[in-house]
Curated annotation (Swiss-Prot):
This is ATP-dependent Clp protease ATP-binding subunit ClpA homolog. Keywords: ATP-binding, Chaperone, Chloroplast, Nucleotide-binding, Plastid, Repeat. It is found in: Plastid, Chloroplast. The lineage of its organism: Eukaryota, Sar, Stramenopiles, Ochrophyta, Bacillariophyta. One of its GO terms (cellular component) is chloroplast. The gene is clpC. PANTHER family: ATP-DEPENDENT CLP PROTEASE, CHAPERONE PROTEIN CLPC1, CHLOROPLASTIC-LIKE. Transmembrane segments: none annotated. CDD domains: AAA, RecA-like_ClpB_Hsp104-like. It comes from Trieres chinensis.
Amino acid sequence: MFEKFTEGAIKVIMLSQEEARRMGHNFVGTEQLLLGIIGQRHGIGARALKKQKVTLKKARREIELYIGRGTGFVASEIPFTPRAKRVLEMAVHEGKDLGQNFVGTEHILLALISESDGVAMRTLDKLGVNIPKLRNLILMYIEENQEEILRPLTQAEKFLLEREKKGSSTPTLDEYSENISKEAVDGKLDPVIGRDKEIHEVIKVLARRRKNNPVLIGEPGVGKTAVAEGLAQLIIAEKAPDFLDGNLLMALDLGSILAGTKYRGEFEERIKRIVEEVQNDSAIILVIDEIHTLVGAGAAEGAVDAANILKPALARGKFRCIGATTIDEYRKYIERDPALERRFQPVHVKEPTVGVTIEILLGLRSKFEEHHTLSYHDKAVEQAAILADKFIADRFLPDKAIDVLDEAGSRVRLENRRLPRGMKRLLKELQDTLRDKEESIKEHDFDIAKQLVDHEMEVRTHIRIMKQSILTNETLGLARKEIDTVLEGDVAEVIAGWTGIPVNKISDSESKRLLTMEETLHERLIGQHHAIVSVSKAIRRARVGLRNPDRPIASFIFAGPTGVGKTELTKALSEYMFGNEDSMIRLDMSEYMEKHTVAKLIGSPPGYVGYNEGGQLTEAVQTKPYSVVLLDEVEKAHPDVFNLLLQILDDGRLTDSKGRTIDFRNTMIIMTTNLGAKIIEKESGIKPKTKQDKPAFRIDESGCLGWEPTPEPIKDSALFEKVTELVNEELKEFFRPEFLNRIDEIIVFNHLTKYDIWEICGLMVKQLQKRLEEKELTLEVDVSVRNLLTEEGYDPVYGARPLRRAVMRLLEDTLAQQCLSKPLYPGTILRVSRVKEEGTLASYTNDVKVEIDYRRVDPRLLEQAEEKKEQNQEETKQNILKTDA
C-alpha cells in the first residue's frame, strides 16, 4: 500500500508515529495522523488546515484533553488502529477517484474527514472547522497546485527522513547538540539578510581539502551565528554548491557535554565519541558558538582540555567545524595557541550599515508582528535602525536595532492590554485578515483576496468607530495614537528610556518651554543675560536636531570674576534639563593639578591601583550619556588634561583605559575659569569694598529702594566687546590654540551690580523660607533687613559670595538663636526686622530682631504646651521642697 505514497505522505506517517511516542501511546490513531498532516507543513493538507486556523499547538491540546497521555512505555514498532488503517486505505481510493495514481497528504486528509467518527473528526469539530468548506479547499488546491503535489523533497529533507527511518548514526552528537538544518526545514529560523559575502567565504573554506574549519570573528551582536543559520537555509533550499547537498549543520552545546561529568575521563570520552561520529558521517558540519570556550574546557589537574583533543581532527579535513567568537576572545584564547590558530581560517563578520540593518528588520518584521499580535509601521522600522546607530554607542548593529524594535512592540502590546475586550477582538481579527489576504495573493486566489479586502475595510471601520469612542471617553485616559501599530514615536520612547536622551518629537508644551528658556534661567541666575542667551541657543539647536551630530551639544568656557554665577548657571541648566541640579557631572579640576592625576579621568593603566575601576569622567558619561559636564576651575588642571579634551571637543568621543570608546556627542561641556578677572576689574573701574565706603542704599519716604551713584560694572556694549577681546587675548596666552579653536563659544561674565545683589538676596531669602516651610514655619523678612543684607553683602570684586556670608551671619544665626530660646509650633510666623536707632524715624542699626507670632498656631497645641509648662514648674517646686526637707 505504501509504495504509492509520496515522500510527503511518508513523512506524515513517520510524524504520526513520533506524535504517538511523544504522547506515550502504543498505537497510531486518526488523531496522530491529523497531527502528522499538520506537522508536515509543506503539503496541501497542512496548508488547507492552516487556512482553517488549525495549528499544531491547538490540535495537540484538544487531543490531549480528549484521550490524555499514555503510560510512557512505547514499543519500538507502533501499530495502526483499525480506524487509522481504514483511513489510509480510503486515502488510496481518494487518489484513484481524483485520477491520480499516488497518495499525498491531501488524500489522507480527505479520507480523515470522510470518516464520520473518530478522534480526529471530533478534534476538528472542537476547533470549529467547517468540514464541507475544508473539503472544497483541498479540492481547489489539488486542481490549482499540481506542481506542489509532486514537489520532490530536497536532498537535506531526504537525508533527514533517511536518518529518521534508519536511526541516527551519531547518538552522542544528537544528545549534546541541536540540529540547525532541521530547524531550517521546519521554518523556525529567522531569515538571514545581507550576509551573502560572509556565507560565500565560509563555503570556500569548507571546500578546502584540509583545515576546512572557518571561524567567524566579529563584535558581539553583528550576526555571526546568523551566518551559520544562513548556510543551513541555503543548503535546504538547494542553492548551495553541489558538495554541500544533503549536509547537516549541528550546533554543539559544550555546556551539556560538561554537565554531569563527575569522574575523570568522562568529558574526554564524550568529546572523543563526538569526534569519531562526525568523522564517520561526512555529511555533518559541526557549529560551535563561543568556540574560545574549548580552550581550558574540562581541563582538571593533569587532564587535557577540549581544544587539544580536537586539534588532530581539525587538521585532517574529515572533521568540519564552523566556529564563532568575538575579536577580543579570539585574540585572548585562540591566537595565543599557534597550533590551534593555524587549524582555523578566520572569516571576519563586520557590523552592517544602517541601510542593511533596515533590510534585516524588514525581513524580521513579520516574526515580531506574529509574536506581539500587532503591526509595525515602515517608519518605525527605519527609525529603529537609525536611532539605535546614533544613540546606543556601546553595542552593535543589527542586534541593538532588533532589541529596540522588539521592545517597542512589547511596549505597545502592554499598553493595549488596557483596551476593551471588543477592541482586542477586532485587532486580532484584523491581523488574521491581513495574513490570510497576503497568503491568498501569493497563491493567486484573487477572488478570496477581494473578499478579504472587503472584510478588512469593514473591520477597520469598526476599529475606527471604537477608537473614536475610546478617545472621547476621558475616564480611560488613552493617548491619541494608532493603538494597533508600532509607530516611530514608540521607537523613540524606547531609545529615550534606555539612554535618557530625548529623541522623541517635541511636544507643544516642550516647544513653549524651550522658547521661554531664558526667562526660566533668569529666575535663578541674575545679571548674566549674554551667558543665558548663548546657552539657551545651544540647547534649542540640539533639541530641534540642527547641531552637528558628531560633536558634543555645545562646549563653552565661562570666563569672569569669582562669585558672579559661572557654576550657578551650570547648576541651573542641569536643573532645567533634568529636573535636578545634581544630575550634572561635576569635576573640580584642582584635583588634577599633577601629571599622574590625569589618568584618573580615563582610568588607571594596567599595573596601577584602580585599573579595573574605570575613569571618573568616562564612567560617569558612560552611565549618563545625556548630561552637562562641568569642569570647574579648568585653568588649575595640568596641561595634559587639555590634550585629553581635544578629542572630546572635536569628535565627541574618548577612549578609556579599557579600550572602550565613550560617546560624548550628547553631553554639554562647560569649563569655568577666573582668567580675565583682573582685566574686567580694571576696565570697569571697580575697586574692592572698604570699611570707609558709605552704604550706597537709601530708602525714600514711600519705602522704595534707591542707591547713591557709585562706579558701575560694564554696561556699555562697546566697552563690553573691548573687555571680551582682552579676556580672549589672556585665554590665548594661557591655553594652546588647538584647544581654544575647538571651543564653540567663550562667554565673559560681568561683575554684579548693586541691583543684582538685591535680586540675589531675594533668592537667598526665598531658599531660607522654603527650608522653614518644610518645618511648617513661615518666615517674613522686612525690606529694611533685605537692604542691610545687600549693604553688607555687596562687594564688586568678590561677587555674590559675601552676600551668602552676610545672610548666614545676620539672618540665619539670629533665627537659630530664637528657635532654640523659644518654642516653635507648626504655623508659627517668624518676622525679621531691623532695629531702629532710638530717637529717629528712618535710621537703622546693623542689628536685626525676630518677632514670633503664634496667631496661626492651633490653640490646642498652645494649651498643651502651657499645661506641660505648669506641670514642669510644679515638678520643679516639689523637687526643691524635697531637697530642703
